[in-house]
Amino acid sequence: MKKIIKYSSLAALGLVAAGVLAACSGGEKKDAATSEATSGKKEIIVATNASPKPFNYEENGELTGYEIEVVRAIFKDSDKYDVKFEKTEWSGVFAGLDADRYQMAVNNISYTKERAEKYLYAAPTAKNPNVLVVKKDDNSIKSLDDIGGKSTEVVQGTTSAKQLEEYNKQHTDNPTVLNYTKADFQQIMGRLSDGQFDYKIFDKIGVETVIKNQGLDNLKVIELPSDQQPYVYPLLAKGQDELKAFVDKRIQELYKDGTLEKLSQQFFGGSYLPAEADIK
């Protein structure tokens, strides 16, 4: 399967106390073992931050969204695995995979070399181009060539933050201003609309969803040219090779039988599937 680096992503790789995770994972492993002994199936715990919509979110107290429903379809009628979702902070997604608390995660996760060294990437389930967002009355930013001296908000550890940090290394004479935050994407977009900073780089689907749902009509979206196809992937803990093979096969089947297309239309309002060759 071809791996493709995504331009930006919502997420931030943070730190969680190792002792707390170790204590939690010990208890959860015992619970999982009890569940497996009862059902005869292996329990797979899938972590998510339940954001951004429409990829992952809560509705009436229940998790849903494109990636959540794809996972449900992957494990539907499996005679080997039972799937369970657990909501956690973004930093907890990765820390939980590290501690074997979770076997899998879905959270609009992009491909990076650093993550590929620590985790297993399943086949991609969606494509999600990146865009530049500014206020409609701001004509000073028309492309990435114009962000020098302009300000944005980023979450520490995201691929967008790292990309802009690299931009600043290459443009020391006129760097872009990075304001680090722990706010979620909806809050960040609201502050952009209020004029608290100048621009935001993010995923097209997430941007268009927030603009529509929050009524941020004073923002405009600028397409970013890229010869790389930004994809979204399920991520698995190291050592879960057998699970990865199962997930990859099921994603291929769901692509061929039209399930992925149906879910894409339902949650994205259009076809945002990877190229078939990249799923194999």
Q: For the regions a protein language model found, what residue spans apply to each?
A:
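Acidic, polar ligand-binding/catalytic clefts
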Residues: R72, K84-D146
